């Protein structure tokens, strides 16, 4: 089993959601805080899951295996107020966590990673205070040159949906609803 996840994150405030884990993304079920006291962690499926730990600038990677439902990897002291790239690379039972193209943690899983058929969720329960960019998945372990090229490209800085007035979709216009002219052209705002 091999795969790689890559995401750019910008954390700007650790006080947001104080005392709970802050969700970045996970692949699995949608069960955050539904069956237990609110912690911010999804359970049981994290294949993988990436979170910010409570009250510290640490990242938590959770990976399910057939031997252990939650194997946890902590990456300490990630930078605040700047973009960082986080990659989770799995080959067989080895998990490598990269920060900005450098391996910061290597963890040997107790068993084969458990792959689930769940969806990918981002920023659940309000996520974290900051930004996310370019969440990518590959069904193989990326090599060092590919990892470095992703870091060199940097995050996508284009905001999606940041200003609804720029797009001016016609279905927000009331002209089509209130027009009484009988003309389809007038009723639909001049189509």
Region annotations inferred by a language model:
Residues 1-191:
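Extracellular glycan-associated modules
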């Amino acid at each position: 089993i091999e795969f790689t996840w890559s995401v750019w994150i910008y954390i700007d405030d650790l006080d947001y959601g104080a005392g709970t884990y802050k969700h970045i993304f996970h692949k699995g079920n949608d069960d955050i805080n539904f069956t237990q006291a609110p912690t911010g962690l999804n359970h049981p499926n994290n294949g993988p899951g990436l979170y910010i730990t409570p009250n510290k600038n640490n990242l938590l990677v959770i990976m399910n295996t057939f031997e252990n439902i939650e194997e946890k990897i902590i990456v300490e002291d990630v930078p605040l107020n700047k973009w960082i790239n986080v990659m989770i690379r799995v080959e067989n039972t080895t998990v490598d966590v990269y920060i900005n193209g450098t391996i910061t943690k290597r963890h040997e899983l107790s068993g084969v990673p458990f792959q689930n058929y769940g969806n990918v969720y981002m920023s659940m329960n309000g996520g974290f205070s900051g930004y996310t960019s370019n969440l990518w998945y590959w069904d193989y372990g990326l090599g060092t040159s590919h990892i470095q090229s992703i870091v060199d490209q940097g995050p996508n800085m284009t905001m999606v949906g940041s200003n609804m007035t720029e797009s001016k979709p016609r279905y927000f216009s009331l002209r089509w609803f209130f027009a009484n002219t009988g003309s389809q052209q007038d009723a639909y705002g001049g189509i």
